[in-house]
Amino acid sequence: MTLNKVYYSGGEEIRDLTIVGGGPTGIFAAFQCGMNNITSRIIESMPQLGGQLAALYPEKHIYDVAGFHEVPAAGLVDSLWKQAERYHPEINLGEAVTRYRKLDDGSFETTTKSGKVFLSRALLLAAGLGAFTPRTLPQLGCVDHLEGRSIFYAVKNIRDFAGKKVVIVGGGDSALDWAVGLLDAAEHVTLVHRMHEFQGHGKTAREVDEARDKGVIDVYMDTEVTAIETAEGGMKNVTLLRKNGASVVLEADRLLILIGFRSNLGPLAEWDLELVDNALVVDSHMKTSVDGLYAAGDIAWYPGKLKIIQTGLSDAAMAVRHSLNYIRPGEKIRHTFSSVKMAKQKKNEQ
């Protein structure tokens, strides 16, 4: 994904809507702003758009987004951006929002950690689950010098594992997905799980079982990684401890730890907004407890909320649409079919 400098701004200009978070929900919200003739900006704490999909799972395939029978996470992010970029949303990357202030005229002032201040007529929080850090294996001690070289917490590039002896730790969806997904690239794959049963999707668990039965993957259940040995700055082997007390030493070039992430809303949790289960309570219009401040995606809570990408996209459309009532009060909102709007826009571009 390439972002042209024309999309960047110092924040001096007031926009109709500031979107905090540049994941799928935030990007789609920017597209919806364009469809509704709303000027927008995205503020994203990461150095790239895409949220967790780009930062953690760019090569993971997604199967539950309408219209895509299968799509790589990075491919979905690119598709969403291609929709949004025609409306030239202002993009601010590497900027972590720390506070907001509602001004006397009802507009919003949003401040980032670097001290930048952004003005907008309304505010949309689409920051997912907030800041996230991977769960580690504390029994290994300090392994900072190996992270990104021999020890990984996500698959960002399959080439990092090509031709390597890979030990994967975990029993959830990500661990199972990559136990299968790395079989063709890696020299050998070993899956280690501390529980007796997998917690991931049944279909993928069966694929792992079938691969084990064929002898193309080793699986250790009721087992933990307790130590690693290095040589010449890289990993040489890992030590496993089985529930029965037996110890196993395996040759390994790569240790892929996929046991989940800790999420933290950070400053957002201190904004005096109503929270349930570490998410912001919204009404049927995606409005929080503050007029003009909306939330969408995983950061938003309402009864029956399902935290999947598809729901986040719907939330974004709802939030943007209803923000019009706050941004331009009294204006009659008319629905325009996307095909009609695009036809007019293409005609004007000729």
Curated annotation (Swiss-Prot):
Gene Ontology MF terms: ferredoxin-NADP+ reductase activity; flavin adenine dinucleotide binding; NADP binding
SUPFAM superfamilies: FAD/NAD(P)-binding domain
Cofactor binding mode and count: Binds 1 FAD per subunit.
EC number(s) reported in the record: 1.18.1.2
Coiled coil spans: none
KW Flavoprotein (keyword) present: yes
Group of enzyme by EC: oxidoreductase
Keyword Repeat in record: no
Required cofactor(s): FAD
Binding positions for FAD per the UniProt entry: T25, E44, Q52, Y57, V97, F132, D298, S339
Keywords, in A-Z order: FAD, Flavoprotein, NADP, Oxidoreductase
Catalysed reactions listed for this entry: 2 reduced [2Fe-2S]-[ferredoxin] + NADP(+) + H(+) = 2 oxidized [2Fe-2S]-[ferredoxin] + NADPH
InterPro entries from the UniProt entry: FAD/NAD-bd_sf, FAD/NAD-binding_dom, Fd--NADP_Rdtase_type_2, Ferredoxin-NADP_redctase_2
Family of this protein: Belongs to the ferredoxin--NADP reductase type 2 family.
Binding partners and assembly: Homodimer.
HAMAP family per record: FENR2
Listed name of the protein: Ferredoxin--NADP reductase
